[in-house]
Amino acid sequence: MKLLLLALILVLSNINLISGNGLVWPHPRLPCSPYDERGCINTQKCSSTDCDSFKRRIYFDVAYNTAFTIYQHTIFKYYSANYYKVELIVGGKVYFIHKFGQFRGDDCEFDEIIPAFYKKVQFLDLSTPIKATIQFSFDFSSHPKHANIYYSCIDVWLFDSAYYNYCPTNSGGGSGNSGGSWSSGGSGNSGGGWSSGGSGNSGGSWSSGNSGGHSTGDCPTSSGGWTSGSHSSGSWSSGGGSGSSSGGQSSGSWSSGGGSSSGGHSSGSWSSGGGSSAGGGSSSGSHSSGSWSSGGSSSGGQSSGSWSSGGGSSSGGQSSGSWSSGGGSSSGSHSSGSWSSGGSSSGSHSSGSWSSGGSSSSSGNSGWMTASGGNTGGNTGGNTGGNTGGQSSGNSGWMTASGGNTGGNTGGNTGGQSSGNSGWMTASGGNTGGNTGGNTGGQSSGSSSSGGNSGWLTSSGSNSGSSSSGSNSGWLTSSGNSVSSSSGGNSGWLTSSGGNSGGNSGSSSSGGNSGWLTSSGGNSGGSSSSGSNSGASSSGDNTGGNSGWLTSSGGNTGGNSGAATGGNSGGNSGASSSGGNSGGASSSGGNTGGNSGWLTSSGGNTGGNSGAATGGNSGGNSGASSSGGNSGWLTGGVTGGNSGGATGGNSGGATGGNSGGATGGNSGGATGGNSGGASSSGGNSGGATGGNSGGATGGNSGGATGGNSGGATGGNSGGATGGNSGGATGGNSGGASSSGGNTGGNSGGATGGNSGGATGGNSGGATGGNSGGATGGNSGGNSGASSSGGNSGWLTGGATGGNSGGATGGNSGAATGGNSGATGGNSGGNSGAATGGNIGGASSGSSSSGGNSGWLTGGATGGNSGGATGGNSGGATGGNSGGATGGNSGGATGGNSGGATGGNSGAATGANSGAATGANSGAATGANSGAATGANSGNNAAVTGAANGNNGAAAGANSGAATAANSGAATAANSGAATAANRGNNAAATGAANGNNGAAAGANSGAATAANSGAANSGAATAANSGAAAGANSGAATAANSGAATAASGGNGASGAANPGSIVTPNDQNVSPLSNSDAAATAASTTGRNPRNPTSRAPTVTPTPTSSAEEPAAGGEDSSAISKYSIQSFGIFVLSMIIYLVI
């Protein structure tokens, strides 16, 4: 009896101290619910317990309000004195986030909204998700006998969607074999965008799943996330030499260069380069899904979503969504959605296959993955009106080209072909105004070729067939360009071996075609080239095409505008001229051609066809025709247009080119310049040694003192009236006809035609460039049968091609004199030339389409080349790229680009590559990287409308390479995209988010690491410092060396952005993606889906971490109420004990 009574006393005296509180959702370390109370009574702080890495699958967006479900098990009477507190733990530091009262005293579950707290964590670099822990504390310490504080912990990936959006729109899906856009599914429930699924529940965007049930990923708004496989998903691995990435769960791994990626569950692996994965190797496994394989073979039982480029084959029982380009075959019993170019796609269920080839030529529409929308309005409206009268060079895009050709081909292609407009990310509006007004006038009669349109991924069979299309480049391959027609050149991303070999072979020549990695066979072809803008008349032909990497909004704004009746005006008079090369009285639109760029090409042609005024492609393209090259992904920027032509044109021969005297180079008379005879398809082949180079000392050089130099007054100079000048109508004019000039837009033009020997050629005379001689530039040049403008590539080409390769020789000769002549360089060039130079009028014939530049440098390179003022790229005052005063690219005073001995600039040798030696990288010395001085570095004033960090050549591409201190993306302090305070100020990158530095989002300077920036290991470089980026120093670099560098610098340029969209899930001790139920729950719990405008964020504030001693004071009752409660409880206990003792 006494024992029972004693128990009752203890219960009565402690009745108000029983409590239990914790989180039900989202996924705490220890669950707390009516069914599992382990997490309800946890008294250890989160920092004292182990993180459950498996549950770190919540992506917590600080930009949104988020709901948390709390389970409260307490019978406190005075609950209003309690409060709950929310804190964030990052790197061992604790930060206060939110606090709210207990409010309720019953046993229940309820939801509490935690407001967005991005302002409280602005000091964190959330450009990519970081590990963090959210700590909920349930404080009951204000009650008698010091009740405990209970903790619930959630391990999350913290990110800010204002700068980092990891969730795609997952469209489509469903059971069966093929489900979902951007994806092809295998058996099971494959349905997710950007993915190809194996068996099981594979449906994740940007992923390919293996045969498991875990491949729905982390995105709460999609049925599939960014990951696939049960473990190790989405990992990036670049470089590694002979290393290997293999194992049972290697999924989504990137492997570039040398190594091998294989194993039982190798899914979504990227493999490029040597080793056993690409270039003749193989990527295989029992569940090889979504594998990228180039040149080799990808096979296995469930090979789904495999990419295969080259002569290999992709086959298997469930080969779905396979990409196959080239002579290979993609077949299987369930081959769905397969891409096949030039080969065969067959199977019992072959649906939605892409196959281009056969006898008809379609300029094709390439893109990176899809061109959804790109060709919707484009070829829909375009092919109806546009392609009716001719071929359309197609419209490509990297992500989407929606709207890109909507307005464009609709009005544009009505009368003839459109060179199309491509973009990397979006080309919305890119061709809206362009082809609308441009191609209306039925230009492109006769045999024409559009300036070509580059894409990012594939150019599936675009140029195959009997007709000529404006060339369509791709990202991976450009096979299928064989047959007898000429295309404006076709480039690829990985290889373009034979790219234009078969393609441009036969009777016509194309402006050469480069690739990403290699451009072997790039410029081979026949004796003639088709002109894109031929015909009776035309206005605003968008021949050159307007491509861009990220956005091309406004890409043709200045282009076809500035050129208006100018540049391309008088030019192709005579029988006909289309677009910028309109014939007769006037033309609008002008040289759409060189308006490309890597990041943005907004205003890309502003200076280009603008500055060129009536210069540019005017009078130029006399003779049969010349197609402006088409660039690709890796090499060539400037190399394009006037590049390819640069080789022929300014080169002609060592002494020919810009030098040679009156009959030399662009001058030489009618047949001189870019012509150099019946035809010259020098294009951009050979990289640095090709095109304008012909050898570092070749082409424009003809010898250091040869070519453009010949001495200060030699080469293109020859005296004021010499070289390109030759007199008012002399130089490149050589008489009535002029220009050919804008072959690569004003870009190629900058380098080639107008540049040729940049300095010499366009300079020598008067105010230089196309100015020098009134009708200078590519004037007289393109007479003769034809010349193709050459085609640039992705990475180096820029200065390397046209003005570069030749930059060394040609522009060197006379140091600053060369390109300078006057500091105008190409300034006076297309400008001074005014109605002179390229107007020349007389040239008729087919036409020439402006070239189209490539991916990285080409940007500014496109239009007037990197140099905002144009003429010559990069140079602040024009002249030749890079050089402060113009002169020759790279070196401050010119000479041989990159440095006196740069000779082989661009591609050249390692040491002098890119931009000379480390100290003098890019241009000038380290302090004066890019063009400007140290103080102005990154703000390359020459770049029209460019804001902080937008250096010369492209949107924000900081100095060519620069030294460690001033490397492309510079150090944290000098980062191209600036420090955290200046995040997202990359004005030129339209729509680019935080830290989209220069070339790509955070692509570290030229290539390289801080130590080896741009100079020593530039270009293709070694594996460690690879231009395309291998390993630790890959394009997007490591956190420490990333484009925008360290967190202290605002985290500009994270690796993910370098490959937009392919964001991977950070690996944390075998991270597992969310299940379907998790994803649904996450979606249901997120509120306020209207992200703020990143540009309106408050200034960066670094809060001081709070310790427990600094926590906000508890709210609730006053001390008197608590005392009364304590006395009451104590009284119950004493009274009970008296009763017990009496009994």
From Swiss-Prot:
The way this protein sits in the membrane is described as: Single-pass type I membrane protein
Comp. bias (Polar residues): 1062-1078
| One GO cellular component term noted in the UniProt record for this chain | membrane
The annotated region (Disordered) lies at 177-1120
List all Low complexity biased stretches. Answer: 222-236, 284-296, 331-368, 393-403, 445-498, 506-541, 906-1059, 1094-1114
Could you list which ranges are Extracellular topological domains? 21-1121
The UniProt record lists the keyword Amino-acid biosynthesis: no
Topological domains, Cytoplasmic: 1143
Task: Kindly list the places in or outside the cell where this protein is found, as annotated in its UniProt entry.
Answer: Membrane
- Which key words tag this protein in UniProt? Membrane, Signal, Transmembrane, Transmembrane helix
Residues annotated as transmembrane:
1122-1142
Q: For bias kind Gly residues, which ranges apply?
A: 177-203, 237-283, 297-330, 374-392, 404-418, 430-444, 555-573, 580-596, 604-622, 629-783, 790-843, 851-905
Q: Give the range the annotation lists for the signal sequence.
A: 1-20
What is the official name of this protein in its record? Answer: Uncharacterized transmembrane protein DDB_G0289901
The top of its lineage is: Eukaryota, Amoebozoa, Evosea, Eumycetozoa, Dictyostelia
